């Protein structure tokens, strides 16, 4: 999911 992808974590810190 999103939180397993570093760029996605960086772009969505509120959900990760």
Swiss-Prot record:
Domain of life per record: Eukaryota
GO molecular function, one term: toxin activity
Keyword tags: Acetylcholine receptor inhibiting toxin, Amidation, Disulfide bond, Ion channel impairing toxin, Neurotoxin, Postsynaptic neurotoxin, Secreted, Toxin
GO cellular component: extracellular region; host cell postsynaptic membrane
Keyword Disulfide bond applies: yes
Record PTM Cysteine amide, positions in chain: 16
Protein name: Alpha-conotoxin Tx1C
Organismal lineage: Eukaryota, Metazoa, Spiralia, Lophotrochozoa, Mollusca
